[in-house]
Amino acid sequence: MIFIMKLKNLLPIFCFFLVSFSISSAQKCGKTGLFKPNDKYDINRHLLLSSLASNVSARGGFYNASIGQGPDRLYASGTCIQGSEPELCSACIDSAFIRVIKKCHNQTEALDWSSFNEEYPCMIRYSNRSFFGLLEMTPFFKNYNATDFQVNLTEFYQKWEALMLGVIADAISSPNPKFYGAGTGKIGIQTVYAFVLCSKDISPWNCSRCLRGNVDNYKLSCSGKPRGHSFSPSCYMRWDLYQFYGFIEYRASPTLPREKGRISELSDDGGKISTRNILGITVALAFFITVLLVLGYALSRRRKAYQEFATENDITTSGSLQFDFKAIEAATNNFQKSNKLGHGGFGEVFKGTFPNGTEVAVKRLSKISGQGEEEFKNEVLLVAKLQHRNLVRLLGFSVEGEEKILVYEYMPNKSLDYFLFDHRRRGQLDWRTRYNIIRGVTRGILYLHQDSRLTIIHRDLKAGNILLDVDMNPKIADFGVARNFRVDQTEATTGRVVGTFGYMPPEYVANGQFSMKSDVYSFGVLILEIIVGKKSSSFHEIDGSVGNLVTYVWRLWNNESFLELVDPAMGESYDKDEVIRCIHISLLCVQENPADRPTMSTVFQMLTNTFLTLPVPQLPGFVFRVRSEPNPLAERLEPGPSTTMSFACSIDDASITSVDLR
């Protein structure tokens, strides 16, 4: 009976731990006005907010911008922790974008202070009025635990406020304010953790004013509640009894007063709790926490498995904008041929212009393509989760009957092959531009293989899938045949080979095996094409043998006459050492044995560290020899007369839809 009474006394504490898992985000939709779905303001909102993740993470944790004119003009900003991992920042901004679009679906103003997976805080905000650089302390929002805190509140809040002020001072300390702070302190038997964050476009003084206002408002309205957070448009504050953001260093606050004695913890009747009772409470509480954690873990695993099963193939949960098909038709002038930019194995690409003047690239999947639906779903689900300056950005999609549309950011300079393989235009690609393209593509592939939340094998790297922005910066595109690897997965095998001839490694063509090293091989071929200025397939009969670009370069390398490779269109204005080093790296990438090929991380080091000694390249894949018998697989790959070679593939680099390996 006594034990049951003690358990009764523990229920408020037990409820506290239950409630403590609830704080993760807070979205506030403005009441200043509404807009109609798919009008100019709605389009501007999606276009600007969908680009926040990449821009905020690429600019050190803060970015603001506006888009549109007159009443359709929209202002937006994003805030992360300065100096934090770009991938965490990007993921948090992306999740906030998805939430605010869903909850504030037609409000002209909204903000979201949130955390990604309870591990990383960030903020996004948009409005139809300019708020850049303005201190805005209202409206004030709060969230707190409903359980009463059983402590001496006067003594507790004296030290709690000292901790908060110390954290605020850390956030605005000169000479380089961080605009965020984190601290911890011991108050009685409790360890308290605190965190603050300000929008970086306000001054340090205004940051302090905003946070102090939050502290005062919280004390007035949430006194006696253990844990909580409060925020206004310009700043955010959170405190709790556990280390809620695991990656942040919580410094012991220098302003926290030294304790003169223990804070008296009161029982329900107002008396002191004895040592024996404290021990009993501690044991019982430990038991409840253990049970809670076990149950919580089991339930979370079950819920996560169900959610993954339910959403794995649902593109509506991808976070991308679903455009109205009629808006796409209007933007492309009903897919008029004059707006056509090109075509691929699964459809055509058109230029589109929205009413606000925003230009986009619209990929219309072929209705008769056997793999079109799979390609479409794969591209939406993968690319929506990727954010990098060297990857083309997916703005959204549209589904209308048999029509399947992908909407991308528009690249005014089209693709690399548009310049590289045209005898007139390739003169515009000097060596510095080509070298920057090589380095940019390296960064993009490295992100796919190593630095993103997913491990992505592209499987179709080629000049036609490298788009160029207005400054000729490269962006990798076309993820229709890409595959996502598990964390512990290094390779996979497929019975259907997809990709482009001339770029596919021998183990993939012959056996359907692909891995990160498959992309490395394709990248090696791409480097050679950039240097030579010709397609890999343009090198045929060489000294009585069937050849390709890899064969040709290997022979010149062995003869030490590799500078004959250099595209004459570049003239003499190129760095010979850089060119030779790039040729050397490319030959390392196209080695026959995948284990001999470097990783993209190593390739990046080879390109950026000229003092790094490069190993001697071994025999590359696809060193062709004359063979009298026809190759049946090659006949299936490329219609027409069969091509004789030592591996089952065509020397043409035409794109293919699929090949069934038997």
Curated annotation (Swiss-Prot):
Compartment(s) where it occurs, according to its Swiss-Prot or TrEMBL record: Membrane
Entry GO MF terms: ATP binding; protein serine kinase activity; protein serine/threonine kinase activity
Keyword set, alphabetical order: ATP-binding, Glycoprotein, Kinase, Membrane, Nucleotide-binding, Receptor, Repeat, Serine/threonine-protein kinase, Signal, Transferase, Transmembrane, Transmembrane helix
PROSITE patterns with a match to the protein in the record: GNK2, PROTEIN_KINASE_ATP, PROTEIN_KINASE_DOM, PROTEIN_KINASE_ST
Residues noted as binding ATP in the record, renumbered to the chain: 341-349, 363
Residue ranges annotated as Cytoplasmic topological domain: 299-662
Name of the protein: Putative cysteine-rich receptor-like protein kinase 16
Originating organism: Arabidopsis thaliana
Underlying gene: CRK16
